[in-house]
């Protein structure tokens, strides 16, 4: 399981970085060709190959190797201005990869325990708020507690853990004959998030780019009831 999480995280982060660099090509290999080679490399490297023996196994191994070499070429490639492969930010898929890694890592310890996941969700949401405030003074404390090398200041991870929490609530309380209890829980969570959004708005703007707590709370205020609505449908 750990290996699966690791390699899926690597794939998402790599795809995010390649997608980001495809838009910065200036001369030489065109943006279109970079993107085409990039996608081919993705499919060859991370494609799900059937189990095989003999010649087919050799062929699949060669295809995967070709994908890795193709992506390696794109990493070392420099355009006509000498611009190399860059990591300016992680890209959308890269952020998803980091979110997946953190949330999956937490779930390895909490498993299907609703109580443990609820606590983990609360802690991650709290970290998202704290990371945008001055509640932890000092550079040392911030580095140890907030882990700034993890992008999005815990906001995206709060979204991920909200999904985990909702899934476990559905597993525990959802009932087709009596859906009201589960939907009521989600609506209550939505109201709670709306209250937090209104309370936090004077302190932070609504900004997706900055991943502010206010944006997080407004999004969750919509997410929980909407999930209940689609479940009812």
Question: Could you tell me what each predicted segment is?
Answer:
Residues 1-233:
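Alpha-helical transmembrane segments and their immediate juxtamembrane cytosolic regions
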């Amino acid at each position: 399981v750990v290996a699966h999480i690791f390699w899926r995280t690597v794939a998402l982060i790599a795809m995010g970085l390649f997608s980001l660099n495809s838009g910065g090509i200036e001369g030489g290999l065109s943006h279109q060709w970079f993107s085409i080679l990039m996608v081919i490399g993705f499919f060859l490297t991370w494609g799900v190959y059937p189990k095989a023996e003999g010649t087919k196994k050799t062929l699949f191994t060669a295809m995967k190797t070709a994908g890795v070499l193709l992506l390696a070429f794109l990493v070392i490639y420099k355009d006509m201005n000498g611009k190399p492969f860059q990591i300016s930010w992680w890209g959308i898929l890269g952020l998803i990869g980091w979110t997946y890694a953190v949330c999956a890592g937490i779930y390895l310890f909490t498993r299907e325990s609703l109580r443990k996941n609820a606590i983990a969700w609360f802690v991650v949401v709290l970290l998202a708020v704290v990371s945008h405030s001055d509640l932890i003074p000092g550079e040392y404390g911030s580095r140890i507690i907030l882990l700034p090398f993890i992008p999005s200041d815990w906001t995206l991870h709060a979204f991920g853990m909200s999904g985990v929490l909702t899934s476990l609530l559905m597993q525990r309380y959802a009932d087709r004959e009596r859906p009201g209890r589960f939907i009521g829980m989600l609506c209550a969570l939505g109201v709670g998030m709306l209250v937090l959004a209104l309370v936090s708005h004077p302190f932070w703007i609504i900004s997706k780019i900055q991943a502010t707590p206010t944006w997080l709370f407004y999004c969750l205020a919509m997410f929980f009831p909407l999930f209940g609505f689609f479940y009812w449908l």
